[in-house]
């Protein structure tokens, strides 16, 4: 899932589309290593052990980009790989964004797939407001 694949209708309905390699196939060639999609890949994708919680990571990356209006760990693919595979995600306060929203995104971007929230947990938004 990438931000580029989220489609919002005039009536506010959000849909997920997949354009694959249709518009920028050259970006994915071996000769031109500018893998744009890497920035939203979950760490486990690189080891081949991925599932629904990998999409949760990608969803969190999309939410972060929407809030920051910039890629969630830089423009450079090398930086993207380092953050996803090696380092921890550097969470910082986002001006104008509620702490509840930031906590929600943090639940998506947990490196350990076993600790990362599931889709069901994320859909139960009331858990963020419970005392």
Positions of PLM-derived features:
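Structural helix C-cap motif within protein kinase domains
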Residues: 68-72
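Terminal C-lobe "cap" of eukaryotic-type protein kinase domains
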Residues: 110-131
């Amino acid at each position: 899932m990438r931000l580029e694949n989220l489609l919002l209708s005039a009536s506010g309905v959000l849909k997920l589309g997949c354009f694959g390699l249709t518009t920028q196939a050259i970006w994915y060639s071996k000769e031109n290593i500018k893998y744009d999609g890497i920035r939203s890949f979950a760490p486990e994708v690189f080891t081949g052990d991925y599932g629904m919680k990998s999409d949760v990571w990608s969803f969190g990356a999309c939410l972060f980009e929407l809030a920051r209006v910039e890629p969630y760990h830089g423009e450079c693919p090398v930086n993207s790989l380092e953050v996803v595979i090696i380092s921890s995600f550097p969470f910082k306060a986002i001006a104008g964004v509620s702490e509840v929203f930031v906590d929600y995104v943090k639940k998506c971007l947990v490196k350990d797939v076993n600790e990362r929230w599931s889709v069901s947990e994320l859909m139960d938004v009331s858990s963020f407001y419970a005392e």
